[in-house]
């Protein structure tokens, strides 16, 4: 969940490193630092808190001259968030500095060994063992020392290392943590995310596990785990840095909410040709699939919960949803007749990767739905469908969720047509409804100008409940998550039919209850639950299709969405809940794009 950057060239490195770290802020962090080689010494500057603090400390890098360096944003896993534990970490002799993203599982064993040999530790981090191992193994060959040190590490790591003996060289190593090289002219880069590179180059090389890269201003050489040089082709990034800017909105999150109709259209349009859904390279014999398991974490898991209903209804195949953080430790009934659908915006979610590998080991074929091309999940999956959402900077996902759900809808209809469970007029009707989703999402954005006023009414509430049934319940899960993660208000989602089994005891006078009422098949039942909570003093904010007079007569406040087939409506139904969470958080003065304690990409377990 940390971010790392590296640079070597002819210009001052520190401003480049600071700029790169700023582009990685969305990943979440609690401290930041840079290290720049200055002749026979390495200048290290690090701070607790925001990158702006580091800019001020270094006067935007002017106080740290030098043309080769590394940088880091830290999200604490070992040791408290403070200046001492912040990266980069230096060797005792001052010859090396390292930045690290990941977790070293055997660091205590290595630390004890190094302490016995006389190495001094300044921090509580697992990372510091790495730089002392490099110093221990160094005998004049920088690369060999790193390879020997890496061979001792158990866990996940992306490393960037500099050495005073080779002041124009930076080395990068990857093992189970993303790392991308940026290919420049007279300068070269690395970063844990392409977002940090696109201001400088659009030509990138994705490192694989076990690979080491040696970067100088004029060259990049990649080596395999045995130290043999290998040739890797550069890929071209098609979007530029403007795609990652706020575009006039107060926050990235609001910008990304507003981008959703376009993102969903970009996900749908290339995949519908001549009245058919075309999913290139999805060469699955669906007749041999007896069960589908959807696994993910966080919002991606809730997208899977919503997609489950549509896939199961249209394809008539049993579908289960499993939290990846639980599935990886279970003993699941998975075999060669199981299709595993894996959802991850970044494609680097550690628990999801582990669950995916375990299910593949048991014979399942894995279909990945990810946003980031070249990500770990995309590479190890048997099949991959990209969401084409573009970069998502705010920690709380919006268009990542809706585009994942859109791909699940595409898959459901594609699979149903292939299996013969949906044909003819019904297929055409659903395909037309699918094509209309971007327009319906835009309508959902436009038809609720009162949401900021509703936020003013509800922002002081200590807790909220989100209720719904069937597909509405799946949307309630994500709506509650959005509210809690950016507004810091306790928000819980419940299947509406479960209220009587305990939760209704928590309803108090004035308690906000957000009721999702867009599934016609269960609307009457949900209405009875609205009556129950109102009888106990709850304030009900209902989400329903425009023109639903029955709900209007019951609810205290209304949010409307355009009429859509219930099997597809979650994509539009979530939009006003995203807006509600955003404006409530804004009323509460929260750090909307970077909520406390959260990280964008959870690349550690």
Feature locations, PLM:
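Glycine-rich phosphate-binding loops that contact phosphosugars or nucleotide phosphates
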Residues: 288-436, 516-560, 580, 588
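Glycine-rich oxoanion-binding loops at beta->alpha junctions
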Residues: 67, 71-84, 267-284, 307-343, ...
């Amino acid at each position: 969940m940390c971010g790392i950057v590296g640079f070597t060239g002819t210009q001052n490195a520190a401003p480049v490193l600071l700029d790169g770290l700023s582009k990685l802020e969305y990943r979440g962090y609690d401290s930041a630092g840079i290290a720049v080689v200055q002749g026979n010494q390495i200048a290290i500057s690090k701070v607790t808190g925001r990158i702006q603090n580091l800019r001020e400390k270094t006067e935007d890098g002017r106080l740290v001259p030098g043309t080769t360096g590394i940088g880091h944003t830290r999200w604490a896993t070992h040791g408290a968030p403070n200046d001492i534990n912040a990266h980069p970490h230096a060797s005792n002799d001052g010859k090396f500095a390292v930045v690290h993203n990941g977790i070293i599982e055997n660091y205590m064993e290595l630390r004890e060994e190094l302490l016995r040999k006389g190495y001094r530790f300044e921090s509580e981090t697992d990372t510091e063992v790495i730089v002392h191992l490099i110093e221990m193994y160094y005998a004049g060959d920088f690369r060999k020392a790193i390879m020997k040190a890496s061979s001792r590490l158990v866990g996940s790591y992306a490393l960037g290392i500099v050495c005073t003996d080779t002041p124009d060289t930076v080395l990068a190593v990857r093992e189970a943590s993303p790392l991308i090289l940026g290919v420049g002219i007279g300068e070269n880069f690395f970063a844990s995310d392409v977002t940090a590179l696109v201001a400088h180059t659009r030509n990138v090389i994705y490192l694989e596990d076990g690979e080491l890269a040696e970067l100088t201003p004029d060259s990049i050489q990649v080596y395999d785990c045995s130290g043999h040089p290998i040739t890797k082709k550069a890929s071209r990034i098609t979007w530029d840095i403007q795609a990652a800017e706020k575009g006039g909105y107060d926050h990235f999150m609001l910008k990304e909410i507003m981008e959703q109709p376009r993102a969903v259209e970009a996900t749908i349009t290339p995949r519908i040709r001549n009245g058919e859904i075309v999913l290139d390279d999805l060469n699955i014999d669906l007749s041999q699939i007896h069960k589908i398991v959807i696994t993910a974490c966080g919002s991606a898991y809730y997208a899977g919960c919503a997609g489950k209903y549509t896939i199961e209804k249209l394809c008539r195949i049993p579908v289960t949803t499993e939290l990846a953080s639980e599935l990886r430790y279970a003993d699941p009934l998975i075999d060669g007749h199981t299709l595993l659908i894996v959802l991850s915006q970044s494609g680097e979610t550690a628990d999801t990767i582990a669950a995916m590998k375990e299910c593949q080991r048991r014979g399942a074929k894995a279909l990945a739905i990810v946003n980031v091309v070249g990500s770990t999940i995309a590479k190890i999956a048997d099949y991959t469908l990209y969401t084409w959402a573009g970069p998502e900077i705010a920690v709380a996902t919006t268009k990542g969720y809706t585009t994942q759900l859109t791909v699940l809808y595409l898959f459901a209809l594609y699979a149903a047509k292939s299996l013969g469970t949906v044909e003819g007029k019904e297929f055409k009707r659903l395909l037309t409804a699918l094509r209309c989703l971007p327009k319906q999402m835009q309508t959902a954005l436009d038809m609720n100008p009162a949401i900021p006023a509703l936020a003013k009414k509800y922002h002081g509430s200590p807790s909220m409940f989100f209720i719904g049934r069937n597909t509405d319940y799946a949307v309630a899960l994500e709506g509650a998550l959005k509210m809690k993660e950016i507004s810091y208000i306790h928000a819980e989602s419940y299947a509406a039919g479960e209220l009587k089994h305990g939760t209704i005891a928590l309803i108090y006078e004035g308690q906000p209850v957000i009721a999702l009422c867009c599934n016609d098949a269960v609307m009457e039942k949900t209405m009875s639950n609205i009556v129950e909570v109102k009888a106990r003093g709850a304030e009900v904010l209902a989400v329903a299709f425009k023109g639903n007079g029955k709900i209007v007569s019951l609810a205290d406040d209304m949010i409307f969405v355009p009429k859509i087939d219930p099997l597809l409506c979650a994509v539009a139904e979530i939009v006003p809940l995203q807006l509600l969470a955003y404006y409530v958080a804004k009323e509460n003065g929260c750090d909307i794009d970077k909520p406390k304690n959260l990280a964008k990409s959870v690349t550690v377990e």
